[in-house]
A protein has these predicted regions:
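The alpha-helix within a helix-turn-helix
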Residues: 15, 26, 56
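A short, Lys/Arg-rich alpha-helix, primarily the initiator
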Residues: 1-23
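Residues in the recognition helix of alpha-helical DNA-binding motifs
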Residues: 14, 28, 39, 69
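Intrinsically disordered, low-complexity basic tails/linkers immediately adjacent to helix-turn-helix/homeobox/MYB/SANT
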Residues: 57-65
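Short, charged recognition helix plus adjacent turn
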Residues: 38, 67-80
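The DNA-recognition helices of helix-turn-helix-type DNA-binding domains
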Residues: 32, 43, 70-74
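Short alpha-helical DNA-recognition segment
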Residues: 19-38
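Short, basic-rich loop-to-helix N-cap that marks the start of a DNA-contacting helix
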Residues: 43-57
């Protein structure tokens, strides 16, 4: 699994856990709906740290909590 897939999967998981839609996340995080859609559809190759931080704010979690999953613990460095 690459970076963008792992991030998209984590966002979907958090939306499901909190019972919010991607549109609702756009409202609470101040991240444009088009940006969230791009991340979830795998069109965004590398979501920026500021965007992920805003999404975390919308979820009311820290960056550490966002990345604190087994998927990210086993991440290998991607060199391209």
């Amino acid at each position: 699994m690459d970076t963008r897939e792992a991030i998209a999967r984590r966002i979907r998981e958090l939306c499901r856990q909190r019972g919010i839609t991607p549109n609702g996340l756009a409202t609470t995080s101040a991240v444009p709906q088009a940006t969230i859609k791009s991340i979830l559809n795998g069109e965004s190759k590398n979501p920026g740290a500021v965007t992920i931080k805003k999404l975390c704010d919308g979820f009311e979690i820290t960056l550490g909590e966002f990345f604190s999953t087994p998927e990210f613990d086993t991440w290998e460095q991607e060199i391209k």
